[in-house]
Amino acid sequence: MIDGEPAQLGQKVHAGQEVRVDGKCISISRKQIVLAVNKPKGMVVHPAAGNYDGTLVNALLYHCGDSLSGINGVLRPGIVHRIDKDTSGLLIVAKNDFAHRSLAEQIKEHSFTREYESIVFGNLKNDEGTVDAPIGRNPKDRKKMCVIEKNSKNAVTHYSVITRYKGYTHIKCKLETGRTHQIRVHMAYIGHPVSGDEVYGVKNEKVDFEGQCLHARKIGFIHPKTNEYIEFTSELPDYFKKYLKKLENISSH
């Protein structure tokens, strides 16, 4: 579906249009050789075992054809960085290899801005802070990540409090590095896991969260062609706003 109408084979998507894949809405903004995609919660970025259809890459291929970077191969065309299936929000897609290399280098040099918002369990002691702790595969469960010294990569997350609620905190996180599950692992490491996180979170939360509350809110980078700094922002999705409202009601009693 494009803007609520059935899509036709070969139909192109234009800036500001909304695309639906398996009922999930994707908003796409174009800036010449890069695309900013607002991914919905519950959508996998690229095909993998158990998720071959209904991915973001499937949608990009359908609407962009072969005009995507090929650096990451046929399974991840245009994908410069990823966000988890149950994380909503922004990611950048490269339309050619030149753009891909430029964006990847900015990520490597830590000049690529990525800001998230999350609801975490408990009340943070300080209004802001930094978690500087290496992340690697959990030796007891290879599907999970953990803070570990051996066979790990440096990882740095800056956080600040937006609003405090009874038993929970609404925070902003800024990534200095971009490791797998970084925010989820780091916040769990300091005792304040992302609410609704079924992997790293707490059991039996007071609020019935349906999946993790983590949204990629802002992305900023130097445009590969114009050399201008540009930013994209994404409004908090309805699911996130719903939980903030619940927390407001709980905290007011």
Q: Where are each of the predicted segments found?
A:
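Glycine-rich beta-alpha junction loops
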Residues: 122-124, 177, 204
